[in-house]
Each structure stands twice: as C-alpha cells, then as structure tokens.
C-alpha cells in the first residue's frame, strides 16, 4: 500500500482539524455573543493583544527553535523539550505574576479599558499553559508527528466549549449573573486541558 509523504499527510490533517475547529469556534462565538452580549464580546476581544504579546515573549520563538532543533536531531528531542519547557516557563511565570498583580494598571493604562481589569487575572493564569502547549507542539512538529498538535487543538476547543456550557448551566440553575469572565475561564480551562493532553501523550 502506497504511503504518502509525511508533509502531505501532516498538512492535510492540520487543515482538516483547523477547519473543524473553525466551525466549532464559529458557533461558539455566536453562543458567546448571545450569552454575554456584544459589549461583553468586545471586552473579551480587547484582552487578546496582551495575551498575544505574552505568548510572543514566552513561547513563540522557543516553539520555532525547538521544532527546528528536534527536526535536525530527533534523538535529542526530549532533551531539547525539557530545556525549552524550563526556559519558556521561566519567562511565562513572571509574566503571569506581573499581569495578575498589575491587572488594574494594565487595563486602565495599556488597554485603556478599566472594565477589562477583572478579566486579566484569569487570562494571566492561562499563559503558563500556553507556553507548555506551544513547546510540546514544537517538539512534535519537529518529529513530524502532527497528529498530537492537531488533536490538542480539538481537545482545547471542545473542553473550552463544554466548560463554558457547564458554567452557564450552573449559573442559570443557581441564578448567578453571567459576565464576560465566563469566556476567559473557558479560555483558561481549554489551554490547561490541551497542555495536559500534550504532556500525557
């Protein structure tokens, strides 16, 4: 039986999974907009530039370097992964502490939206999990095992949606007001789930 080149199969798998996650994300955003409203969704979107900067500082370049090093020397991949995790977390944890501690200042002075202050602590807690997830994905990309990063995306998206639905159900049952913080907790839980999935595989 003819086997396809790993680049082709990997690309097809990532494309299919990416498309599936986009569809899930599309319906998830519709649900969020109806649950927390347009204003809440806007506040949720406003915190992502800060999240993107934190990711770029603690994970982005490290993920790329790890992928290249692992591809060049697969037998040293595990050692590269351990070093990358240590380096990434050594940056991610102080960033988490800074964002958590100075949430009010960052919301008012950087994001120019004081209403975002309650969202930043939960966002900050997701950063170490993002770092772990990124490093693990870089490692598996280097080994040309794209199935793990692909399915970690599915795990993240599904757990995020399920957790948000569960929180909404609990809030409705107990008559607790639903706020935009719901979406950020969903993000945190999804990132944690994908990080744990990658570490356990």
Segment roles from a protein language model:
Residues 45-69, 125-128:
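Small-residue-rich midsections of specific transmembrane alpha-helices
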């Amino acid at each position: 039986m003819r086997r396809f080149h790993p680049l082709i199969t990997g690309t097809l798998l990532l494309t299919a999974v990416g498309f599936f996650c986009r569809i899930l994300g599309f319906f998830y955003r519709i649900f969020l907009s109806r649950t927390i409203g347009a204003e809440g969704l806007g506040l949720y979107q406003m915190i992502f530039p800060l999240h993107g900067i934190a990711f770029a500082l603690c994970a982005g370049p490290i993920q790329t370097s790890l992928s290249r090093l692992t591809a060049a020397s697969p037998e040293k991949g595990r050692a590269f992964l351990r070093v990358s995790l240590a380096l990434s977390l050594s940056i991610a944890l102080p960033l988490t502490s800074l964002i958590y501690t100075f949430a009010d200042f960052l919301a008012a002075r950087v994001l120019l939206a004081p209403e975002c202050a309650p969202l930043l602590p939960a966002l900050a807690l997701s950063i170490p999990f993002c770092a772990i997830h990124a490093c693990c994905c870089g490692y598996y990309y280097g080994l040309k095992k794209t199935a793990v990063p692909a399915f970690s995306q599915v795990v993240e998206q599904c757990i995020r949606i399920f957790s948000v639905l569960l929180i909404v159900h609990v809030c409705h049952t107990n008559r607790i007001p639903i706020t935009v913080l719901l979406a950020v907790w969903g993000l945190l839980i999804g990132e944690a789930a994908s990080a744990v999935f990658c570490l356990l595989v």
